[in-house]
Amino acid sequence: MAATALAVRSRIGAWSVWAMQSRGFSSDTPEGVRSGAGAVRDAGGAFGKKEQADEERYFRARAREQLAALKKHHENEISHHVKEIERLQKEIERHKQSIKKLKNDDDD
């Protein structure tokens, strides 16, 4: 039964690769059709300028949001590492005290 399922999966996988190769990619444009046909920006004029301004505004806002999120992520990482450093320094101090105690016990 497992072999049958494996055979079916392999046939489906092979077929899907074949279908992708024969279909091409969605960005391929058919002959006779301009790229971006029907787009408002390509038409020019006031609507095209407004569309371009809106698009640029959107991407600037998106970039600002991404930078703010990245900054917050880095700040969280820094605070995490500072806490980890403090924890490890306490561990080091604890081990030093243990060694000191062992030396004192050994001297007695």
Curated annotation (Swiss-Prot):
Region named N-terminal inhibitory region: 26-52
Keyword Transferase: no
Transit peptide: 1-25
Residue span of region Disordered: 25-48
NAD recorded as keyword: no
Coiled-coil annotated spans: 69-108
Cellular component, GO, one term: mitochondrion
Main location: mitochondrion
Subcellular location: Mitochondrion
Superkingdom classification of source: Eukaryota
GO biological process: erythrocyte differentiation; heme biosynthetic process; mitochondrial depolarization; negative regulation of endothelial cell proliferation; negative regulation of hydrolase activity; negative regulation of mitochondrial ATP synthesis coupled proton transport; positive regulation of mitochondrial outer membrane permeabilization involved in apoptotic signaling pathway; positive regulation of proteolysis involved in protein catabolic process
Pfam families membership: IATP
Molecular function as annotated in GO: angiostatin binding; ATPase binding; ATPase inhibitor activity; calmodulin binding; identical protein binding; mitochondrial proton-transporting ATP synthase complex binding
Residue(s) carrying N6-succinyllysine: 103
Residue ranges, annotated region (Antiparallel alpha-helical coiled coil region): 74-106
Domain notes: Forms an alpha-helical dimer with monomers associated via an antiparallel alpha-helical coiled coil composed of residues 74-106, leaving each N-terminal inhibitory region (residues 26-52) accessible for interaction with an F1 catalytic domain. The inhibitory N-terminal region (residues 26-52) binds the alpha(ADP-bound)-beta(ADP-bound) (ATP5F1A-ATP5F1B) interface of F1-ATPase, and also contact the central gamma subunit (ATP5F1C).
PANTHER family linked: ATP SYNTHASE F1 SUBUNIT EPSILON
Subunit structure: Homodimer; represents the active form and is present at a pH value below 6.5. Homotetramer; represents the inactive form and is present at a pH value above 7.0.
Its job: Endogenous F(1)F(o)-ATPase inhibitor limiting ATP depletion when the mitochondrial membrane potential falls below a threshold and the F(1)F(o)-ATP synthase starts hydrolyzing ATP to pump protons out of the mitochondrial matrix. Required to avoid the consumption of cellular ATP when the F(1)F(o)-ATP synthase enzyme acts as an ATP hydrolase. Indirectly acts as a regulator of heme synthesis in erythroid tissues: regulates heme synthesis by modulating the mitochondrial pH and redox potential, allowing FECH to efficiently catalyze the incorporation of iron into protoporphyrin IX to produce heme.
Family, per entry: Belongs to the ATPase inhibitor family.
Protein name from the UniProt record: ATPase inhibitor, mitochondrial
Native organism: Sus scrofa (Pig)
Source lineage: Eukaryota, Metazoa, Chordata, Craniata, Vertebrata
